[in-house]
Structures are given as structure tokens and as C-alpha cells.
Amino acid sequence: MPLFAIGLNHDSAPVAVRESLAFNAEALGDALQSARSETGADEVAILSTCNRTEIYIRLPHTDPEVVIGWLTRHQRVDLRKVRPHLYVRRSTEAMRHLMRVSAGLDSLVLGEPQILGQVKDAYHKAANAGCLGAVLERLFQHAFAVAKQVRTDTDIGSNPISVAFAAVTMAKQIFDDFPKRTAVLVGAGETIELVARHLGQQGIGQVLVANRNVERAKRLAEAHDGEAMSLNDLPRRLPEADVVVSSTGSSLPILGKGTVERAVRARRHKPMFMLDLAVPRDIEPEAGEMDDVYLYTVDDLRGVVAENMRSRQDAATQAEAIVEQQVRHYLEWRRARDAGEAIRSFRSRAESYARATRAQAARQLSRGEDPFEVIEWLTHTLTRRLVHAPTVGLRAAAATGDRTRIQHALETLAIDQQLVERSSEGDDSQQAGADGGAARGDRRAAGGS
């Protein structure tokens, strides 16, 4: 059964598309059962985070469109909307993908550790739903081993290197008394969540989260001991902000120059650090013309992030090598497992032949037939039955000139190649002798006539 990894992530799809395919954690068990029954899958696991939705699945066929069709139907999403953002990884690429994801090599933030916990959650949910078999079980264990080795043997997670971290670092350069400061975060997506996390780690005094969807703002605020509000409340609460970080998907500015100007006056011209991470921009660029406003965009942070990325390229290269090593180990296990299944099947067939032939021999003996002749019949019949299938395969390979297949068969059956060649030469000599004798006989017959 082929293995697939099917889904989308932060590189292939915007937040709006990712949200449409995200699975509710409480309903994931039912979704797993549905995926298994409707696609005919042998095994299935679903990884759903704010950055990605991925289905790892073993199918009895090679058509991933069945899974894509199930996914869009189950999530009630228009296939045309999400199809351009989906990727399909097959076999070895699917194995490699899960290992890279688990190690943080496919994350928005290179090497971020949170993804490993999310992969483990996906594994446990699939196991609890009875949707894991030997193949996915072993694959997840190899993925966990990769993540652990990458953490232990490389510096991939030594320092956070994200736009969010760079933003907070820059804010701290302006305010050295962070515990006394208030941050207003506009938006509630992954980037803002990372900003909130780093602000908390740096000891920010208070966090206010403004978002069009207040429920999402509440969830984010509660996770960081903050306060939520709607975008309509933002102008009224903006004067409280020492730090403003905005990242929404709005096509128009959220904060105009006039709103910022009124907030600065209400603050009695105390400095305000503003970072606009959105594209298109959330904050009118004219707001940065005021003396007390320090307005930056994501482009102003790229240098910091790129420098940190360069400093960790060696670690990333080491991590990729670890992934490749584990992919090889997993493939070795898969091949050994597949061979084991073939061996068990072959032995089962041989034992079935033996039982049937033995039963026939017993009936012959019960009829009083000569035991020696029965033994001769038994050995001849059993040998013929056991070698029939390999013989048919060898003849088919010989007929097509497939020498590689013949060589593999000889090695598998432990047949000496030199013995085969000597036997072939002997057959040729015998045939030549027979041809010569026939020719002499023809001459004798001609002379005697």
C-alpha cells in the first residue's frame, strides 16, 4: 500500500485558506474514522496546527484525489479554492516530510520546538482512534527520533530566529523597562501569537489584543494573561500602547495617521514603538513622520532575521543529514518487513502443498499401494509443485531477455551461477553431439541407399 502526505502549510497557503481546512481537536477522532472509511485507507493520521493541515495515509490504491475529495467534503470547502495550495508527497518523500516537520525544518520559525508536541498529539489521536498500523506507527517513532537527535546533536534550536522575535528584540532596544510597558497587538494569527509569546518571555507588563474576530482575540489574550478587544475599540485604547505590533490580512490600513496622532497627544508625546508586519500595510506610513513615533515595517527586520538564519545554516545542514539517515533506516525496516511478509506467504503456500500432497499419499497407502512407489510419487509431486511458480517466472524472464531478473532469482534461490552455465554448456555439447550423430546417420543412410 502506498504512503501519502497530503496537505498545505504556511508556505503554500495564506491563513484564510489554512483556517478553512483546520480540524477541531475535539472532533479529530471522528474525522480520522471518516477518512479511513471513505477512502479505504489502511492507516491514517491528521496533523492540524495554525501553520499546517496534513494527512498521512496508506491507501490500497495510488490515487490521492480520493483523499483530497474527502478532505474538502468533510471541511465543507470549495475544492477550487484550496486545490492550488495543496501538495502531495508520495512514499519516500512522505516519510522524509514527516521527519522534517517533526524536527522543525519545515516550520515558519526554523527549528521551533512546538511542532514536535503537535506531531505527538496527532500520533496519539490516531492511535486512540485505532487508525495506526505498523507502518505509520514505525514512521512516527522514527520522526520522534529525528527530532530528538536534531535537538541533541545540532544548534538548530539555540536561538529564536523569527520576525516576531526580531520585533520584540527591537522593542526592547527602545524600552529598557519592559515590565512597566503595555503592548497592543493587532490581529490574532500565527505571527501575532509568536509576538505575544516572545513579549511574555521578555516580561512585558500588559498585553492587549485587538482583532476583528473578538473570540479569536480572547483565546489569544487568555493564553498570555492579556485583554481582548474589537478593532472598533482600538482607537480608544491606543493611547495605552507603548508597543504596537500589527499583522492582519486587511487590504486597507487599520490605523491611520490621524488616529495615531490623537493617541500620541493623549500620551503627552511619550514615545510609541510601532511595527507593521502586514503586507499590504496595516499602519499608514505617514504615521512614522511624527517625532514620537518609531514606525518600522517587516522589511526593516529582514536583516536581523537573515543574519540569524545564516548563523544557523550549518545546524540546518546537519539536521537534514540526520533526516536522511533516519529515512534510510526506516526504508530498511520497510523492506525487511515487506520481505518478511513475502517469506511468510511463501512458507504458507509450501506448507499447504505439503499437507495436500501428504493427504494424497496417505490415501494411496490406505489403498494398499506399494510404499516405495508412494514415496517416489510424493517426492516427485511435492518437488514439482514447489518449483512450478519459480520455474514459470524464470521462463518468462528468459523469454523477454531480462537477465537482471534471472540473476536476482538465482541469488534468491541460492543457485550457483557457474553451475547453471556449466549445465548450459553441457546441454549445448549434448545437442551438438546429437546434431553430429544425426548428420553421420544421415550420411550413412545416404551411402547405403
Swiss-Prot record:
Q: Which residues bind substrate?
A: 49-52, 107, 112-114, 118
Q: Which reaction does it catalyse?
A: (S)-4-amino-5-oxopentanoate + tRNA(Glu) + NADP(+) = L-glutamyl-tRNA(Glu) + NADPH + H(+)
Annotated GO biological process: protoporphyrinogen IX biosynthetic process from glutamate
Q: Which Pfam families has this protein been placed in?
A: GlutR_dimer (PF00745), GlutR_N (PF05201), Shikimate_DH (PF01488)
Catalytic EC class? oxidoreductase
Q: Where is this site: Important for activity?
A: 97
Q: Which UniProt keywords apply?
A: NADP, Oxidoreductase, Porphyrin biosynthesis
Asked whether the UniProt record includes Oxidoreductase among its keywords, one would answer yes
Protein role: Catalyzes the NADPH-dependent reduction of glutamyl-tRNA(Glu) to glutamate 1-semialdehyde (GSA).
Summarize the subunit comment: Homodimer.
Would you identify the family this protein belongs to, as annotated? Belongs to the glutamyl-tRNA reductase family.
**UniProt protein name:** Glutamyl-tRNA reductase
Which organism does this record belong to?
Halorhodospira halophila (strain DSM 244 / SL1)
Gene designation per UniProt: hemA
